[in-house]
Design a protein with these regions (language model features):
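Repeat-blade elements of multi-bladed beta-propeller folds
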Residues: 20-30, 61-83, 102-129, 149-182, ...
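Short loop/turn segments that connect beta-strands within beta-propeller blades
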Residues: 88-91, 133-136, 194-197, 268-270, ...
């Protein structure tokens, strides 16, 4: 049962308290560790078993792509069907709706204190970057790049030093399924905007060479290249060096470039590239390859690019290291100053959805790099077994400390791979999976401390039918005594759903009858 029963959809009290917004980065901090410190959460390995479902909100789209921002009494979340929402933290009622972003919200919600108060920032998949007043829900500014004709804003921006850095991909990855579309001409990139005014400060494309006609099909349809190299995910920032670190995707068309499937270091002030390190050569692939469309390159690559933001963490030897996870199932450790590879670890067969898909997490104090493995059975190294599950690596040398694999031997239902981003806190890491499972794993040995099946119907707090399904993309968030997750992700043949679920630590039961019976857990 929900601790808060069905409420009216709109709140009577709409005032948002805005002094403690969290988090302000997709990766929790500028280094993208996805580790929530003790001062920001009371959830730990000792009490995570007390998590209970507080309320469920019915999203108006069946493929939620947002990651929440939480304050003292408000949850800001992007419902692509309704736009950015300000929800009451206690009941889930709606304080305001930002209708300008309806149908578009695609990122985590970020915030920054300005002269007029708290400003929220996020991207719409096709509309660009929004700056919104957190008190009123009114648009302050909206900006798009002009350098590319069909940009796609699929990654979360990063706020630093009065600027907002926006990753850019391209709609051509999907347009390529149209055999009469001349694929492809566009490049991914990263753009910097003034966070106060929305003025574009610089733009760095991932491909500097302009596209040219490289052939034809159907006699008259021109084939173009090079193209692609999208930036799917949030940048990582190191304020000491002033460098942004970006992961790059595949080329959409021939010829392949040295910038695809690569890691970039970029000067945050100038937008100049500092170094680039490519890991997979010749990876040219687009959605047309899935249906034998003539826009597919003549010799398509494996589509084993990078989707997870880089992580900066200490390796326990007083050295800052850049850790990146690839869809191929590899983890690479690099020197952030030069791009030199320190070590790499091949964990799994990989595939179109990973391998490592959306994100890693790092607990520097424990010396652990958490690596979720999807190994969705499509693409990848077919000669290797699939090993979906959670891996814990030693930050120093990449050795496996422990692993907890999903049992797929008698699979009855959807693939339970760990594709979404994960989040860690003291003594634990929390991960969702493509079958709708949500679990907290012990940092010590990987044992499951708490679990919950989100792939079902929920009693809703608003007027929208509410069903959980695949968990993907941004994954769960831990803040204060809450755990939040969007369940249902209808992209790439996954199970669609529309539930925003909010869990809360229940009060510890007082033993009044001297019984030794264990407390009932909130798992199913």
């Amino acid at each position: 049962l929900l601790s808060a029963q069905v409420h009216a959809e709109d709140c009577e009290e709409t005032q948002a308290k805005l002094t403690r917004p969290f988090p302000n980065f997709w990766g929790i901090d500028e280094h993208s560790t996805r580790f929530v410190p003790e001062e920001s959460t009371s959830i730990s390995a000792a009490n995570v078993h007390r998590l209970k479902l507080k309320w469920a909100y019915g999203i108006e789209t069946n493929s939620p792509r947002s990651y929440p921002l939480v304050t003292e009494n408000t949850i800001f979340f992007g419902d692509s069907g309704a736009g950015l929402l300000a929800l009451d933290r206690e009941t889930g009622c709606v304080k305001w709706r930002h209708k300008d972003s309806r149908g578009n919200v695609a990122s985590a919600i970020l915030s920054r204190v300005t002269e007029s108060g708290l400003t929220l920032y996020f991207t719409g998949r096709r509309e660009g970057v929004f700056a919104v007043d957190a008190t009123t829900g009114k648009t302050i500014w909206k900006a798009t790049i002009t350098q590319e004709p069909v940009p796609l804003y699929s990654g979360t921006p990063l706020l630093a030093d009065g600027k907002i850095f926006v990753p850019i991909s391209s709609e051509e990855v999907g347009l390529s399924i149209n055999p009469f579309y001349g694929c492809c001409t566009t490049s991914g990139g990263i753009a910097a905007f003034d966070a106060t005014t929305g003025e574009q400060l610089w733009y760095l494309p991932t491909i500097e060479e302009p596209a040219r006609v490289i052939g034809r099909h159907f006699v008259f349809v021109e084939k173009w290249g090079p193209s692609g190299v999208p930036v799917w995910s949030a940048p990582t920032y190191d304020s000491q060096s002033g460098l942004l670190f970006l992961v790059r995707g595949k080329n959409y068309s021939d010829p392949a470039t040295i910038t695809s499937d690569a890691i970039f270091a970029v000067d945050a002030d100038s937008g100049k590239r500092r170094w680039v390190r490519q890991f997979t050569e010749g990876d040219t692939f687009n959605m047309g390859c899935l249906i034998n469309c003539p826009n597919c390159p003549d010799a398509p690559g494996p589509d084993l690019d990078f989707g997870a933001p880089p992580v900066i963490a200490s390796n326990g030897k007083d050295q800052q290291v850049l850790y990146v996870g690839q869809k191929s199932g590899h983890v690479h450790a690099m020197d952030p100053s030069s791009g030199e590879v320190l070590w790499n670890k091949h964990l799994s067969r990989g595939g179109y959805l990973g391998g490592i898909h959306w994100g890693l997490a790092a607990d520097e104090k424990a010396g652990i790099l958490y690596v979720p493995i999807s190994d969705y059975p499509s693409g990848g190294h077919s000669d290797l077994p699939a090993v979906p599950g959670m891996f814990a690596l030693n930050l120093h040398d990449g050795s496996v400390l422990w692993k907890n694999l999903k049992d797929t031997s008698a699979l009855d239902g959807f693939w339970p791979g760990l594709s979404p981003g994960v989040v860690a806190a003291e003594g634990l890491v929390v991960a969702g999976d493509l079958a709708g499972g949500l679990a907290a794993y012990s940092a010590e040995d990987g044992s499951v401390l708490w679990q919950f099946d989100t792939a079902k119907n929920f009693t809703r707090v608003n007027g929208v039918d509410n069903t959980g399904a695949s968990i993907d993309s941004h994954g769960p968030l831990i803040v204060d005594d809450l755990l939040l997750v969007a369940s249902g992700y209808g992209g790439v043949n996954m199970q669609p759903g529309n539930a925003l679920l909010v869990f809360q630590l229940a009060q510890e039961k007082v033993d009044t009858d001297d019984s030794s019976a264990p407390e009932e857990q909130a798992h199913e």
